[in-house]
Amino acid sequence: MPVNSAVVESRAMGRLCSSRYERLARQQGWMRICGIDEVGRGSLFGPVVAAAVVLNPRRRIVGLDDSKKLTHDRREELAQRIREHALAWAVAEIDASRIDAWNIYQASRQAMLAAVGNIRPAADYLLIDAMELPLSIEQKALIHGDARSISIAAASILAKVERDHLMDDFDQLYPQYGLAQNRGYSTPDHLEALKRYGPTPLHRFSYAPVRESTCWAVNATQEPLPLAEISVATTPATSAATAASTSTPGTTAPVLD
């Protein structure tokens, strides 16, 4: 069984997004290299979303970078190319009730575990953005990994696009909070809406701005979903054609402790 040898690097240099870490892993004999990242840790509303991506080394995707540096249209374009050309990808989300029950660190970790657990065939090497995972898979944690590794960048793009789509849907349910624009983060307009309307059941009540908003107790009615159910969208593809046709959003994956 491979030894878990996660290494966290914090150097400020060398943050140009490239395939350097993927090449080094292949030189050591690892073939299915999986990038992992999450989006939404700082949001006051909705789920945290994680993605895992195994890129195809023979199908280069130009322009991969930290999702925060990309425009909305560029992220959408790259997300489609990732889904079409990656060897495998999976996206998992942890809802606000579990974030409140567990804390955001544990929720983010569980989302990552659920995503990587749905990569088929399984990855043999992990590149993770700033976190170690309790798995017996060789792994490397990189500070600012989404700006340094193309695999982590690809995961950050898929996670960001998926979460943005969710926020667009939630904006239809709760238009007064401006979720399509602020994505649930603590912008002045969102904080003002919290003061005026109070939070929704999908806000994170463990976060101070939500907890301290007026009338929050009246709205805190959401019951945590069963902890054994995590929403996962996954495409365990073996070819670009398969990747484009076998996405199965809404399947569930077990919680991995």
Language-model segments: residues:
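RNase H-like, Mg2+-dependent phosphodiesterase core
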Residues: 1-257
